[in-house]
Structure formats: structure tokens, C-alpha cells
A protein has these predicted regions:
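Conserved glycine-rich Rossmann-like NAD(P)H-binding loop of the short-chain dehydrogenase/reductase
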Residues: 26-43
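Short, small/polar-rich loop/turn modules that mediate ligand/substrate recognition or access, typified
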Residues: 169, 174, 229-231, 237
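Alpha-helical segment proximal to the catalytic Tyr-Lys
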Residues: 122, 166-170, 227
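Substrate-binding pocket helix/loop in short-chain dehydrogenase/reductase
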Residues: 93-94, 98-106, 188, 199
Length: 243
């Protein structure tokens, strides 16, 4: 992936930050997105040693996507590797869930992936090379009470990934999905110790995953030698869920 122009959405912290850093260390020219200027500056600080940078992008804004991709093409070149990581949650039980809760999660977690992948696919087809990795969730396969919107969006990514793999495979483009299990991030660190212990007891590996666990799985799928892997969902969950 050396010198491949790479776009990682949601690169400020956690899984996204780990992916951006790991790919940059591998030689990719990484641009990571954030939702604020402060976040973009944080991404730039992390990626500058590797020649990367951060940018502000609202992934639900179609015009902003177009403008950002034009900026990247002018400065780094056409995107060859796309990591669709940006995501939000609006957790609540179905009877309490508002339309806005549903729409916000769908727009960020699913529709943005459609828009971004559509936008980068043409230059990828022209180059006859591309890597698209969507970041899903074990919840997209298992479901989870209180996360109907999130689970539906992540399950939708599985179908999107398979369909795009079929459409784009003849052009040297692979499309895959990495589905993390329970990862040690800000969210899980905020859980009470008893709840964290209960969570870990469900995992045969006996621990929470780390952002680096996900990042290295993504790195494999981005490699030139992974060109025969496409349309797959790679579960990285310590044995919590088996396909």
C-alpha cells in the first residue's frame, strides 16, 4: 500500500485513529476526517510524521464529500483506499426511538458509505485498483436490544459490501467489511467494573479487543496481496460471535 492515497473517515480517536496510524506506518498517504477543526488538527498531529493530514468532513453532507475528495485529489491524488469508519449511536428502546434517532444513524453509518464509495469508485475503476473496507459491528449480525437503528445500519453494510464486491470486482477493486466485537475504547472504559467483567466473561478470548486488533485486520485487507479477498465480513471479536 506504499504511497496509496487513503481516506479514513472518523479518524479522531479509537478504531479510526488506530487504522489511520497503522496504514500511515505501512506507507500509505493517509487523510483522516474529523467532525471539527480541533479534531482535524489532532489527526494532522498524529499523521504528520508519516506525511498524512486531517480534514474536517461531515459525512452526511453530499456537497462536503465532493469538496473534500476534490481537495484530496488536488493535493495527494485520487483515493485508492477508502476506509468507511465514521459512525454514531443513538441508543434507546424502540418505543422511545424518534425518527430523528433512526435517520441520524442511517445517514451517518450507512448512507455516507454509499455516497463515499460511489464517489471514489470511478477513479478506482480507471486505475483498475481499489480497496474499500467498511467498519461494521458484531451487532450487525447478532442484533442488540436498544440498538435497532445501529444494528439495522450495520447489517445494511453487510449487504452493501457484498453487492459492491460483485459490481466492482472485475475492475481490480475489493470491498470488504471488518466487524469489531467489544473493543476497549472510551465507551467501554466508562462502564462500571462489574459490567466490564460481565462483558469479558462472554468472550472466549478473555479480554476486550483493542483498536489495534481492528487496524491490523484492516491493513491486511488493504494490501496488494489481498486482491482475491472480496465481499467478505471479517469478524474480529475474540470468539464472541461465530459465523
Amino acid at each position: 500500500m506504499k504511497d496509496r492515497v487513503t481516506l479514513v473517515t472518523g479518524a479522531t480517536r479509537g478504531i479510526g485513529a488506530a487504522i489511520a496510524k497503522t496504514l500511515a506506518e505501512g506507507g500509505a498517504k493517509v487523510v483522516g476526517t474529523a467532525t471539527s477543526q480541533a479534531g482535524a488538527e489532532k489527526v494532522t498531529e498524529a499523521l504528520t510524521p508519516f506525511g498524512g493530514r486531517g480534514v474536517v468532513l461531515n459525512v452526511t453532507d453530499a456537497a462536503a464529500i465532493d469538496a473534500t475528495l476534490k481537495d484530496i485529489e488536488a493535493k495527494e491524488g485520487a483515493v485508492a483506499i477508502l476506509i468507511n469508519n465514521a459512525g454514531i449511536t443513538r441508543d434507546t428502546l424502540l418505543m422511545r426511538m424518534k425518527d430523528d434517532d433512526w435517520d441520524a444513524v442511517m445517514d451517518t453509518n450507512l448512507k455516507s458509505v454509499f455516497r463515499l464509495t460511489r464517489a471514489v469508485s470511478r477513479p478506482m475503476m480507471k486505475a483498475r485498483f481499489g480497496r474499500v473496507v467498511n467498519i461494521g459491528s458484531v451487532v450487525g449480525s447478532m442484533g442488540n436490544a436498544g440498538q435497532v437503528n445501529y444494528a439495522a445500519a450495520k447489517a445494511g453494510l453487510i449487504g452493501l459490501t457484498k453487492s459492491l464486491a460483485s459490481e466492482l470486482g472485475s475492475r481490480g477493486i475489493t470491498v470488504n467489511l471488518v466487524a469489531p466485537g467489544f473493543i476497549d475504547t472510551d465507551m467501554t472504559q466508562a462502564l462500571p467494573e462489574a459490567q466490564r467483567t460481565k462483558l469479558i466473561d462472554l468472550i472466549p478470548a478473555g479480554r476486550l479487543g483493542t483498536p489495534d486488533d481492528i487496524a491490523h485486520a484492516v491493513k491486511f485487507l488493504c494490501d496488494e496481496h489481498a486482491g482475491y479477498v472480496t465481499g467478505t465480513t471479517l469478524h474480529v471479536n475474540g470468539g464472541l460471535y461465530f459465523t
